[in-house]
Amino acid sequence: MDAMLCRIDMHTGDLDAADAWYREKAPRELTHLNVMRRYQYLTQAMVELEDGRPDTVQLTLAPLEPYIQNCARIIDGIHLNVLTAIALYRKKDERWRERLTAALDAAAEYRFIRTVSVYGTAVLPLLEALDWDGDKAWRKRLMAAVRTQAAVSYTHLTLPTT
C-alpha cells in the first residue's frame, strides 16, 4: 500500500514523500528476491529514475527479470522493460531500443496502452526515436495516451535528462 502511495506522491509532485518512502520502506535485500514485493521493486526503480540514478535502476530490476520471464508475468515485464529502456536511454546506451521494442511488442499483443503510457514524457522521446514496425493503429492510440499523460503528470520521472 505504501508503494502505491509513493507513486501517487510522485505523480502529484510530492517528491519529499517519495524519497521518504524510498529511504524508509523500499526493499533493500535485492540479492534475496521476494516476488511478492515486485510492485515495490518497480516503485523503487521509479524513485531511482526520479532521483537521476539510472545505474541503480538496473541493479534494482535485474533480480526480477528471471522471475518475470519464467513465470510469464506480462504486465510486470512491460513495466520492467520500459523502466530499463528509460534508464538505458538516460545513460545513452543504445540497448534501450531492444528493451522498448520488447515492451511494445508485449503491450501491443494484449492491446495494453496504460501500462506504457503511465510513463508520460519519460518514454515519449524514446517512442518518437524508435522505428517500431508493429501495429500502427495501436501505436497511434498509445502515442495519444502518452501525450495526455505527459500533460498532466508532475513527476520528474517524466522529464528526460540530457
Language model regions located:
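Amphipathic alpha-helical segments of tetratricopeptide repeats
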Residues: 19-30, 62-69, 104-111
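Conserved small/polar residues in nucleotide/adenosyl-binding loops
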Residues: 155-161
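General nucleic-acid-binding
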Residues: 93-151
